[in-house]
Amino acid sequence: MAQKPKIDPHVGRLGYLQALVTEFQETESQDAKEQVLANLANFAYDPGNYQYLRQLQVLDLFLDSLSEENETLIKFAIGGLCNLCADKANKEHVLQAGGLPLIIGCLSSPDEETVLSAVTTLMYLSSPGSRSHPELTSLPVVQCMLRFSISASTRLRNLAQIFLEDFCSPSQVAEAHSQQAHSALGIPLPKTEAPQQP
């Protein structure tokens, strides 16, 4: 059985999170970076950690990681942002930091979990008060959701349909349908497990 890492009980939650951030910034190992980012994304589930994660600029660390070439880092980073963006202060930070293009870029990931987290994050960011961010429901995003709404993946299909129904106007959906009919271009669907042929 693996042992838990030894943590100084006097360090506390903030100290532990700071140690994770420092390890992420200082390590050269991609495996270590992936593990640390996964841990930070898991800590982002707990609203009790939000203040510490903001203080340690973990939201910016997640946003920066969306530009990495390592798909695993991107998956954990968008997962962490997804966990954090239900909170108003975190949502505002992501929007003000210019995170939307990075999150929208995750829609073209070949990894389904990354795409699911990106769609959910966009839904959190699209909640009331986000009218000043029209890129959330821009034509390319709506076209992408239309493509996802016919995905073989039930989770992706359902999430895209919710996005289209709850966050897009009927005229936006109609325009996207019309434009898609005239174009073969689009964001590719993420890879899903194909049924095995006998």
Curated annotation (Swiss-Prot):
Positions of modified residues (Phosphoserine): S169
- GO cellular component terms listed in the entry, alphabetical order: spliceosomal complex
The record's annotation in InterPro entries points to: ARM-like, ARM-type_fold, Armadillo, ARMC7
**Which sections of the protein are ARM repeats?**
57-99, 100-140
The keyword Repressor belongs to this UniProt entry's keyword annotation: no
Q: Which GO terms describe its biological process?
A: mRNA processing; RNA splicing
Alphabetically sorted, this entry's keywords are: mRNA processing, mRNA splicing, Phosphoprotein, Repeat, Spliceosome
Keyword set includes Nuclease: no
Q: SUPFAM superfamilies given for it?
A: ARM repeat
Q: What does this protein do?
A: As a component of the minor spliceosome, involved in the splicing of U12-type introns in pre-mRNAs.
Q: How does it assemble?
A: Component of the minor spliceosome. Within this complex, interacts with RBM48.
| Name under which the protein is recorded | Armadillo repeat-containing protein 7
Q: Which organism is it from?
A: Mus musculus
Primary gene name:
Armc7
